[in-house]
Amino acid sequence: ELIPSLLSGAGIVSMDQIDTSYEGTPQRFVTDPSIMQQGFGTNEPFVYENEISQWMKPVAFQYLHELGYSIYPEPITVREADVAAQADCLTKLVPILQRSQLDFLADPERTNALIVDLVDRYQTSWTYSAGAAEFSAQAQLDDGLVFDDPTSGVFGQIDGARIAETVATFVPVLKATGSLAADAVVDPETLYTTQFIDPSITAESVLGED
């Protein structure tokens, strides 16, 4: 309930508007479009407009980062104790990860085809069409979701001020919901390192200016 708690704490919604039983299908929204549903702005708008036969029209949406949910989503993490031991590997791996995301956005067709094929083969109940994949890659660019770190100009660089803001925003929420001990102390500086980042890799150099 982290996101609902954040939105409620900011006065955007009240907890009695929150339904945490969402099971991952569009049925809930289609039957009651007055609700606000959690999803991906790089996926659900396309799916509702093009693939949900009971809807087939645009939906309004807003990104949570515009409301204070300014995390680094799905970061690559390593246990602190393993950083030194795996330093040689990380020195080689991290620049590959930096560059691969940019290379994907520069030419997503081949990777998108592979993802769509794997989704179909594994049949995990997740669905993903070629149209949705194409929309997602383009939306990441059009909506300004992929960009160089504003402070350093490096792609993939962690901004310490942003981490500190995230900690300041979410630690009180985590404590209030019982997910974090009330006396817990979280030092933002201990949560990240830029040690293995290749500073020569930039979105501007690969994707060009907007």
Q: At which residue positions do the language-model features occur?
A:
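Pocket-lining segment of extracytoplasmic ligand-binding domains
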Residues: E23-Q27, D32-S125
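Secondary-structure end/capping motifs
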Residues: A85-G178
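Conserved C-terminal helix/tail region of periplasmic/extracytoplasmic solute-binding proteins
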Residues: G160-D210
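Flexible, active-site-adjacent loop/turn segments at secondary-structure boundaries
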Residues: F46, E74-I76, A81, L145, ...
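A local structural motif
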Residues: L7-S21, S34, Q54-F61, L180
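Hinge/capping helix and adjacent helix->loop/strand transition within the periplasmic-binding protein
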Residues: I3-Q17, A84-D88, K92
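Class I S-adenosyl-L-methionine
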Residues: P4-S8, E49, V116, V171
